[in-house]
């Protein structure tokens, strides 16, 4: 008989095993160590063990749903950080029960919406979430650049790029944040990860900004509408490439009319 417990009530090893087994046949091969799992999924991803649930068959963990709560774009939100079920335990209601616990937890904490991301091609998961009442609101796109010679120099004499501290970055970009940002790129997530921040200034006024880590993952890049197509964004990337000795760049973002 399958039993269900809060993840805060069990050993973290059981949570990790459920995650690892549930993603053992994922369409993208995932090799996540226990340490990386804890650091990422119970760190910047925002999941908390007390908001997460585990399915157990005796002393074997067979499914897990991770949950995290925060005010996301001014709405109290419960996000599903992952839902994973052991391949041998699919189709018998484990996912359904884990989701019921997840939803009830959200209601108990006054959340107004449920939120998650699912990869294109995982049709079984997409069908499951649609059946539960989820609706697609955004598409996430991911891009990589391995040939950084394509970041061409432009004549940007009037643009000065400066290193920023996180508090300055956070305050300065508020004037631009009138569009949807995905969970992994929002300010709360950025604050908990290791990043470098740059600002592009024209006559001491911020006209563009970049957040990038030392592996070249861009979490934020934005240029003021009146200063686009004159090399501001390119200048930010040039400086980051040179100072951080980057060999590649990657970025992911939702569809937007910006």
Kindly give the residue locations of the regions a language model identified.
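Acetyl-CoA-dependent GNAT
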Residues: 21-76, 81, 86, 167-219
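C-terminal "cap" of GNAT-fold acetyltransferases
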Residues: 112, 119-121, 138-167, 254-257
């Amino acid at each position: 008989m399958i039993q269900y417990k809060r993840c805060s009530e069990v050993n973290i090893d059981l949570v990790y095993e459920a995650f690892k087994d549930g993603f053992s046949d994922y369409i993208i091969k995932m090799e996540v160590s226990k340490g990386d799992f804890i650091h990422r999924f119970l760190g910047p991803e925002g999941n908390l063990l007390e908001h997460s649930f585990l399915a157990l068959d005796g002393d074997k963990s067979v499914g897990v749903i991770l949950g995290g709560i925060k005010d996301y774009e001014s709405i109290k939100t419960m996000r599903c950080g992952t839902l994973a079920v052991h391949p041998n335990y699919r189709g018998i209601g484990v996912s359904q029960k884990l989701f019921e616990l997840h939803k009830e937890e959200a209601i108990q904490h006054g959340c107004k919406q449920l939120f998650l991301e699912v990869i294109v091609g995982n049709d079984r998961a997409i069908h499951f979430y649609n059946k539960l009442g989820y609706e697609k609101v955004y598409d996430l796109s991911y891009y990589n650049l391995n040939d950084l010679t394509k970041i061409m120099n432009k004549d940007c004499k009037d643009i000065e790029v400066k290193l920023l501290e996180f508090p300055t970055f956070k305050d300065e970009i508020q004037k631009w944040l009138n569009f949807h940002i995905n969970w992994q790129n929002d300010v709360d997530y950025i604050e908990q990860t290791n990043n470098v921040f740059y600002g592009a200034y024209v006559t001491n006024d911020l006209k563009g900004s970049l957040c990038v880590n030392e592996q070249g993952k861009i979490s934020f890049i934005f240029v003021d509408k009146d200063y686009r197509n004159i090399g501001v964004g390119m200048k930010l990337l040039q400086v980051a490439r040179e100072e951080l000795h980057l060999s590649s760049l990657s970025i992911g973002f939702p569809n937007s009319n910006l």
